């Protein structure tokens, strides 16, 4: 029997989750992508197939003020606060959280908690 790699497990979880999670114009989807070095968050309206706002550790606005490495929990907190601020500026109060197949732990949890603290409801 062959072992399933960690990446394949994440992809399998993501496909399973996306069957049940969709974003609407009333309640868009907060999608999170985590790489080894960076973290990205987008607020997506799946009905219109458009990205309403986004934030990541590669944003110039965030890179200048960020003292922690881009792959750390502190950077995830900063991205969560920034995406929540940008969503609130567009009038978005509630979102559906899409963890992208990643476990709700570490950097993903830090981003989600920071977005909640900044005012997003999910």
UniProtKB/Swiss-Prot annotation:
GO MF terms, alphabetically ordered? 5S rRNA binding; structural constituent of ribosome
Q: Which GO terms describe its cellular component?
A: cytosolic large ribosomal subunit
Q: Could you tell me where the Basic residues compositional bias lies? A: 9-21
Q: Where is this region: Disordered?
A: 1-25
Q: Say yes or no: keyword Heme present.
A: no
Assembly description:
Part of the 50S ribosomal subunit; part of the 5S rRNA/L5/L18/L25 subcomplex. Contacts the 5S and 23S rRNAs.
Q: What is this protein called?
A: Large ribosomal subunit protein uL18
The source organism is: Synechococcus sp. (strain CC9605)
